[in-house]
Regions:
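Active-site-proximal specificity loops/subdomain of glycosyltransferases
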Residues: 48-110
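Extreme N-terminal starter segment of soluble prokaryotic enzymes
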Residues: 1-4
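Short, flexible, basic/aromatic active-site loop/helix in glycosyltransferases
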Residues: 160-177
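A glycosyltransferase accessory/donor-loop signature
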Residues: 6-7, 20-23, 172-178, 190-321
Length: 321
């Protein structure tokens, strides 16, 4: 039986995560009912559970098939037990490292070849058949950020130092326009981890990243370029390594149909984005067949247009809010 592996770290079992998992499960099953879908999710903040979230947790447990749940301790123990390395304090300082460790586990222990990383703040706006066919054929799937080509480049100099100028040459051959790729939705060839399975090479992988908090020593949140570097390390690892070391030629999705943008700035095709319009600037983002409501936006929390779309989906599928 063919299978699709979907994995990520999500905040908690709540309405948003139920929507995300149900949406992609339903899209795939409507196209290919005989495909096995496996979800591997690290639930990061279980202390957020309450009576409302308890309802969504029960729905996740009943409606989402083949769901494998993890917590941070599982992967801390994975690193300790298999590699005799204690990085727990570093991991707590920079939690996005779990995005790197989780697929390593899926490759090394579960022996999977490919997975789709999928955030819980994504709308799938078409029938998804094009994407599913690529995933089933284990072709890396890359969606670009046309307004931020540097979104996945913070590690490029480190990786060139490690692998030599051949790394840059291979990257240029497969991504000649140096597009930047979003890691909230990406089909990843897990063979990129094969060079990091031994203890010394796994430690080498962990030491590739800077373990910095998004808060300074006074407890103030860091912004600007320093925050950008902290936040995009894992995205850079996936975007660069997946392009260079995937066994199959990656599919860079057509930027006219698939793109990830914030709710401000100037889109190269659609022009200036007005974040004070009726969609709070997300009207252009909604033109993409995959809309990712990325974090660097005006305003706190997820935008109203996304939350409304979630509610519309749930009601349409007969789930009470």
């Amino acid at each position: 039986m063919k299978e699709i592996i979907i994995a990520n770290m999500m905040r908690t079992k709540n309405k948003q995560s139920f929507f995300a998992l149900h949406q992609i499960q339903s899209k795939i099953q409507s196209l290919y009912s005989d495909i096995k879908i496996e979800f591997h999710i690290l639930w990061d903040n279980k202390d957020e559970y309450n009576d409302i979230n308890d309802k969504w947790e029960k729905l996740i447990n009943s409606e989402i098939k083949n769901l494998y749940s993890y917590d941070r301790k599982f992967f801390v123990d994975y690193v300790k037990n298999l590699y005799d390395l204690d990085y727990e304090n570093k991991f707590n300082t920079w939690p996005p490292i779990y995005h790197i460790i989780m697929p390593h586990y899926i490759r090394r222990v579960l022996c999977k070849d490919y997975y789709l990383i999928y955030d819980d703040d994504i709308l799938i706006n078409d029938n998804f058949d094009h994407i599913v066919k690529l995933v089933l054929n284990k072709i890396p799937v890359l969606i670009s950020e046309p307004m931020n080509t540097n979104c996945d480049k913070v590690l490029i100099n480190k990786l060139i130092d490690i692998f030599g100028e051949g790394f840059l040459t291979a990257y240029k051959n497969r991504n000649p326009e140096f597009k930047g790729f979003n890691a909230g939705f990406q089909g990843i060839d897990l063979s990129i981890y094969d060079d990091f399975l031994s203890k010394d090479r796994f430690k080498f992988l962990l030491d590739l990243f800077e373990y910095k908090s998004i808060f300074d020593q006074n407890g103030n949140e860091i912004w600007g370029n320093e925050r950008f570097i902290i936040d995009t390390q894992q995205q850079s690892f996936f975007g660069l390594m997946n392009v260079v070391f995937s066994k199959k030629e990656p599919c860079i999705l057509d930027e006219n149909e698939y793109f990830v943008v914030p709710n401000w700035g100037v889109h190269p095709k659609f022009g200036e984005i007005n974040h004070e319009d009726e969609n709070n600037g997300w009207g252009i983002g909604l033109k993409s067949k995959i809309t990712h409501f990325i974090g660097h936006t005006h305003g706190k929390g997820k935008p109203k247009v996304f939350l409304n779309k979630v509610d519309e989906y749930l009601l349409k599928n007969n789930f009470e809010l």
